[in-house]
Amino acid sequence: DMTIRCPHDFDERFLLERLSDLYPSTWRFSVDSLVGASPEMLIAAACGTASSRVLAGTCKPGEGQALASSAKDLREHALASESVSSILERLCLDVRTQGPFLLSLPNVTHLATDVRARLGSAHLLDLVAALHPTAAVCGTPRDAAMHLIEELEDTERGRYSGPVGWVDTAGNGEFAIALRCGLASGTRLRLFAGAGIMPDSDPDAELTETEAKMRPLLDALGV
């Protein structure tokens, strides 16, 4: 994480407007002082169809072909996408996946997979509860990964990487994963970012990736 201080209170409306201008292909949000531009849809529901976008595996812009052939990143992505599709297969009908494909953003390029299914009797909020936390933000197996995070991670995530979204009375809605975000508190803005760790991860490369993922908020601030 990173904390930025300003002489005046942060205006979340300004940050949201800037993120919408700079990162229009993401899901932007501002909820109770948490503002961000997430590229990853945990789960959405509309007209009886559920959809999710899974991201895992990241590189600098322009290096997508190397990413698409990286055994390490493809394995990381497979673990993340399988964690989502396997849960939807238990709770939904006719689960279909499309990917992995390259998703290009101004600051990074991701491996992405879209997952779609028929809702059946499942409610959107049931899917949110079952999917969170995904392997992309927690690890797998989930219980073992959560235990290690509690033991080793010295940063309090708060609402970072949690579900953020909306739902209506008909059960339609969208819940993104709260990524590329910051928590505003008066003159302080705490930025969050992270990277998936695999056995063959390079710590320096993961740090560089994490710094790149902070660019949306930094760009919004003009830093």
Model regions: which residues?
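Conserved hydrophobic core element of enzyme catalytic domains
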Residues: S38-E40, D114-V223
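Contiguous alpha-helical scaffold segments within structured protein domains
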Residues: S51-E151, G222
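Short coil/turn segments at secondary-structure boundaries
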Residues: F29-S33, G99, Y160-S161
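Alpha/propeptide regions of enzymes that mature by internal proteolysis
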Residues: D1-I4, S85-S86
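An anion-binding catalytic pocket shared by soluble metabolic enzymes
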Residues: T3-L79, G171-G194
